[in-house]
């Protein structure tokens, strides 16, 4: 929004920004930065305009000063329209000037997976009612969008993401050297344990990759979502440990 009405901001780390040029009022625009490459332009515009109209209706009986105070309120402060426990405005870099815990507390936790994102249609019925109120987004359209997003998520995981992570696991090999310390042995045992947990099946126990693929194929998306988050964490841990392991080799 800007530091003051006279000092515009070009903070582009936020979800939606008001971009202004004091020398050209007609250049004022809103900038939404949450869309991904798969976003359907027509659907997102329908949702945006429906949400804007809901906000316009709520603000129609309030002064501009009251509306500014509403969007500038602190988390925990009661407002006439916006959620009590959320903050909506920042002139700071939200990635550099806030910790992850602060971002979550003030602005909400972003969904970690596509499944978590799609669950928001069920978790927030009041917000769903807002974007469907005008009739542009019918239940059939939303359900078709949801089904398409989940199919693409499943396909991406099985056909691309899991194979790429499997390659990372296979590339983490034990170093062949005559000079090995106890630290090297300790690190390799941890690394190999993670490798096996991620990618190696046994008769009695399935690897995380196999469990994730099975959950996706069985349509158990809640389980698959949790396993995807765990997979990312384990792969990052593996890469970090292997980097330290390799650097200690001489």
Which sequence ranges carry the predicted segments?
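C-terminal accessory/tail domains of diverse enzymes
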Residues: 1-250
């Amino acid at each position: 929004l800007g530091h003051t009405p006279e000092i515009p901001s070009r903070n582009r780390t936020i979800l939606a920004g008001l971009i202004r040029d004091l020398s050209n009022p007609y250049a004022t625009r809103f900038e939404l930065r949450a869309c991904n490459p798969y976003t359907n332009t027509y659907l997102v515009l329908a949702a945006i305009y429906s949400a804007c109209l809901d906000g316009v209706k709520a603000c129609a009986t309030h002064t501009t000063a009251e509306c500014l105070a509403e969007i500038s309120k602190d988390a925990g402060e009661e407002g006439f329209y916006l959620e009590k426990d959320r903050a909506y405005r920042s002139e700071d870099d939200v990635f550099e000037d806030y910790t992850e815990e602060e971002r979550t507390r003030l602005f909400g936790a972003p969904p970690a997976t596509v499944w978590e994102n799609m669950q928001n249609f069920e978790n927030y019925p009041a917000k769903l009612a807002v974007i469907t109120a005008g009739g542009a987004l019918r239940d059939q359209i939303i359900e078709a969008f949801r089904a398409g997003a989940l199919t693409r998520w499943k396909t991406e995981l099985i056909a691309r993401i899991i194979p790429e992570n499997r390659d990372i696991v296979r590339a983490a090999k034990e170093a062949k050297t005559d000079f090995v310390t106890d630290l090297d042995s300790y690190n390799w045992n941890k690394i190999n344990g993670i490798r096996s947990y991620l990618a190696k099946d046994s008769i009695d126990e399935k690897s995380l990759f196999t469990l994730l693929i099975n959950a996706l194929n069985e349509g158990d998306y809640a389980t698959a979502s949790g396993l995807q988050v765990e997979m990312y964490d384990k792969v990052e841990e593996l890469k970090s440990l292997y980097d330290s392991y390799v650097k200690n080799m001489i």
